[in-house]
């Protein structure tokens, strides 16, 4: 959610954070994988362009001269870029009318009883515009659509900011929630949504006096501006040239690389120095040096230069950290971390620090030292350092890629990644997931023929109806594009599930069915998963089946993980059906939202699942477990170290948003020195310690996840507990799937996450959500 926008959790785009966890201690017994009749149909819809084209033509009732039409995502307005602008203007008009109606009726009992439902409807009106505009801005191939989306975004956020300062809306909501005669007639979900919206109003400064509120708004706008600047410069370098001595350049073993660097010297426009060679930090040159060059001093210089941010970037970071500290002080919080965590699962910064500390201690014991020992042996030709301290201090960040490459050469097997890919076409994975979800949740995927205009690319995008088999009801729709050239893997919520307000007369089915897809009076969720598998470096086949040779898109194991991860989010959106939109599906606590997606990665790494799903694109042979095992061996190198590095980033995130930053305000607004904090954290935590560069200026989550970057690690720990408690014995077990669905997925954000976990794991101690609960989650984790 954007800062200062209480009425909505819009732009529900969830970026992928890839875990490297591999299921351990797995028994080799498997559940029989019986293919449903729909299996081949789903597989062909994704793998054969010819089959897909025929299916689409038949299903949409198209003729030679005409075919039924609609707009993007079945919204009748969204047929042209101007239609998007018209949709936003119509929605604005509807929103303003609804606000006027709410405030004119709030003094009546009936008006009070309907107020929260209408406030939720108002949020939904705005979200449906903002979310689709954000999607178009990021994904759509047309510049005209993108420009219209930008115009729409600005228009809607301007109105959002007006609502933020609407004291009458806030005071009416506050009075309703404080009136027991009214609240006793409201549902628990209405009260929870009302409390959530009140909290967001108050956390946005609505209850302040006018002057203080004006200052607050100015600060939040400044933070937003600085965040945009920070994001725009995230890939910048302090210098794109790294000076090294001629002797260091001579130490490069690859003559072709030396020649390439030499040829770049004429392009250097700085002051030339004798006995100095300028290494350009462009293309693959620095990465080749870090991977292949044996000189420690050369690798160190290149590594530091490659990780140094521009001075202006570090200054931008220091400033938004300072402003966040000031904002939290204005709101009477000890720190920005306290402000951020108040309504999260972790609750306090102290709980987060304890969780991270325990996790790091566990990682050191369970894998970090062992992994670093392997690197140390290679570095010292078989005679590595003796003590744990020596081993940890011995391996520098610029050693990592070089020594890892040597380790991989030593462990090189005859199995190539290409061999494994042949068992995982896109269609095979989606059809396999359909089998898994049918077994676990009694939910099925039904391919649908999209109408003309319903998708942003009629050749690429597949539409899937998600069906609850037991109830014979449609749960929602997925729009899947695995061949985008624009977007890193992402899950976009386009429309949230909710019950229409037909019973209170503020909207009609006839009016809404032009904008959304319905099941009677229920608004069905729409989710889009977008991936960029077409641009994969190892891609050797046509982008689509039916292009030239009918060979499908084949996926690496990492890409299979990606689909499983994103489908975890999608199923949360489909199953988390609520009456009100604000807490549906993935609209739950930030440090709980990754649980369903991370848990799915445990399925994608379990041989009992992946060997059943994987089938050779040509022979239909199942994936041999021995082949998978060899491929996994390469994937888990430095697994514990990678997780430890994530924990260091989470610790840095906490340190930069803690009480000390607020205390520095006494000395002046710009006293924050993020580089000093970064180097201090690195020195303290040691593993691949960086005390030289300003890499923290390249860490985008310091802005986007401010004080909650720990969330992903916490959700991995929770997912491990869920996996061990429910699925480790049999990942295809329907009873376990039902338990997880009923205790976690179906609630969206309407239930305390700790209660969900206590129910799923049968442990009442977790209900308190206190430091003890955090300790239980962190114990004996297999991260």
Curated annotation (Swiss-Prot):
EC number of the protein: 3.4.24.59
CDD domains assigned: M3A_MIP
Cofactor(s) listed in the protein's UniProt record: Zn(2+)
Catalytic activity: Release of an N-terminal octapeptide as second stage of processing of some proteins imported into the mitochondrion
Highest taxon of the lineage: Eukaryota
Gene Ontology MF annotations: metal ion binding; metalloendopeptidase activity; peptidase activity
SUPFAM superfamilies noted in UniProt: Metalloproteases ('zincins'), catalytic domain (SSF55486)
InterPro entries on file: M3A_MIP, MetalloPept_cat_dom_sf, Neurolysin/TOP_dom2, Pept_M3A_M3B, Pept_M3A_M3B_dom
UniProt binding sites for Zn(2+): 565, 569, 572
GO CC term (a single one): mitochondrial matrix
GO BP, one annotated term: intracellular iron ion homeostasis
Role summary: Cleaves proteins, imported into the mitochondrion, to their mature size. While most mitochondrial precursor proteins are processed to the mature form in one step by mitochondrial processing peptidase (MPP), the sequential cleavage by MIP of an octapeptide after initial processing by MPP is a required step for a subgroup of nuclear-encoded precursor proteins destined for the matrix or the inner membrane.
Name listed for the protein in its UniProt record: Mitochondrial intermediate peptidase
Source organism of this protein record: Candida albicans (strain SC5314 / ATCC MYA-2876)
């Amino acid at each position: 959610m954007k800062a200062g926008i209480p009425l909505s959790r819009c732009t529900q785009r969830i970026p992928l954070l890839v875990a490297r966890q591999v299921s351990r201690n797995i028994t080799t017994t498997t559940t029989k994988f019986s293919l449903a009749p729909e299996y081949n149909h789903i597989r062909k819809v994704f793998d054969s362009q010819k089959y897909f084209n025929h299916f689409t033509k038949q299903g949409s009732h198209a003729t030679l001269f005409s075919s039924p039409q609609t707009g993007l995502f079945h919204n009748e307005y969204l047929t042209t870029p101007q239609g998007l602008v018209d949709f936003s203007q119509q929605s604005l008009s509807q929103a303003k009318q609804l606000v006027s109606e709410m405030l004119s009726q709030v003094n009546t009992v009936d008006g009070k009883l309907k107020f929260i439902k209408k406030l939720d409807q108002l949020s939904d009106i705005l979200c449906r515009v903002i979310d689709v505009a954000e999607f178009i801005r990021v994904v759509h191939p047309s510049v005209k659509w993108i420009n219209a989306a930008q115009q729409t975004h600005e228009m809607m956020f301007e109105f959002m900011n007006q609502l933020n300062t609407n004291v009458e809306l806030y005071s009416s909501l506050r009075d309703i929630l404080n009136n027991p005669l009214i609240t006793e007639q409201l549902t628990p979900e209405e009260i929870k949504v009302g409390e959530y919206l009140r909290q967001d109003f108050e956390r946005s400064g609505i209850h302040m006096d006018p002057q203080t509120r004006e200052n607050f708004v100015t600060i939040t706008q400044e933070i937003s501006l600085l965040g945009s600047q920070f994001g725009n410069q995230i890939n910048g370098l302090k210098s794109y040239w790294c000076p090294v001595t001629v002797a260091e350049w001579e130490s490069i073993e690859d003559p072709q690389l030396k020649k390439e660097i030499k040829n770049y010297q004429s392009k250097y426009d700085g002051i030339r120095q004798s006995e100095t060679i300028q290494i350009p930090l462009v293309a693959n040159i620095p990465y080749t040096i870090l991977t292949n060059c044996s000189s420690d001093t050369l690798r160190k210089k290149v590594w530091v230069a490659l990780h140094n941010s521009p001075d202006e970037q570090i200054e931008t970071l220091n400033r938004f950290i300072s402003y966040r500290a000031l904002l939290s002080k204005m709101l009477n919080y000890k720190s920005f971390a306290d402000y951020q965590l108040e309504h999260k699962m972790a609750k306090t910064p102290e709980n987060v620090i304890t969780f991270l500390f325990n996790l790091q201690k566990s990682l050191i014991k369970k894998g970090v030292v062992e992994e670093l020992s392997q690197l140390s042996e290679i570095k010292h030709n078989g005679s590595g350092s003796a003590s744990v301290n020596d081993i940890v201090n011995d391996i520098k960040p610029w050693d990592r890629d070089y020594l890892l490459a040597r380790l991989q050469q030593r462990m090189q097997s005859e199995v190539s990644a290409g061999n494994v890919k042949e068992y995982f076409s896109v269609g095979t994975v989606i059809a396999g997931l359909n089998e898994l979800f049918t077994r676990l949740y009694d939910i099925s995927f039904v391919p649908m023929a999209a109408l003309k205009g319903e998708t942003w690319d009629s050749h690429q995008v597949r539409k899937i109806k998600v069906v609850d088999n037991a109830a014979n009801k449609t749960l929602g729709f997925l729009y899947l594009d695995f061949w985008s050239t624009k977007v890193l893997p992402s899950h976009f919520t386009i429309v949230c599930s909710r019950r229409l307000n037909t019973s209170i007369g503020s909207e009609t089915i006839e009016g809404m069915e032009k904008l959304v897809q319905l099941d009677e009076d229920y608004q069905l969720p729409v989710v889009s998963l977008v991936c960029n598998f077409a641009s994969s470096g190892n891609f050797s086949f046509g982008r689509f089946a039916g292009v030239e040779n009918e060979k499908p898109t084949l996926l690496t194991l990492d890409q299979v993980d990606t689909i499983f991860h994103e489908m975890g989010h999608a199923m949360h959106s489909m199953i988390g059906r609520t009456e009100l939109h604000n807490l549906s599906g993935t609209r739950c606590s930030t440090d709980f939202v990754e649980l369903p997606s991370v848990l799915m990665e445990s399925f994608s790494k379990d041989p009992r699942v992946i060997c059943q799903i994987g089938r050779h694109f040509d022979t239909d042979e199942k994936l041999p477990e021995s082949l998978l095992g060899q491929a996994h061996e390469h994937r888990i190198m430095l697994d514990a170290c990678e997780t430890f590095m994530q924990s260091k980033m989470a610790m840095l995130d906490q340190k930069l948003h803690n009480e000390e930053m607020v205390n520095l305000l006494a000395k002046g607004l710009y006293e924050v020195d993020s580089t000093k904090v970064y180097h201090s954290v690195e020195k303290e935590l040691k593993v691949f310690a960086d005390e030289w560069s300003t890499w923290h200026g390249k860490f985008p989550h310091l802005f986007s996840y401010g004080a909650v970057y720990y969330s992903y690690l916490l959700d991995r720990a929770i997912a491990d507990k869920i996996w061990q408690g429910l699925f480790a014995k049999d990942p295809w077990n329907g009873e376990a799937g039902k338990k997880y669905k009923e205790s976690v997925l179906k609630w969206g954000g309407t239930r305390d996450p700790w209660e969900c976990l206590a129910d799923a794991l049968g442990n009442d101690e977790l209900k308190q959500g206190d430091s003890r609960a955090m300790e239980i989650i962190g114990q004996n984790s297999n991260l």
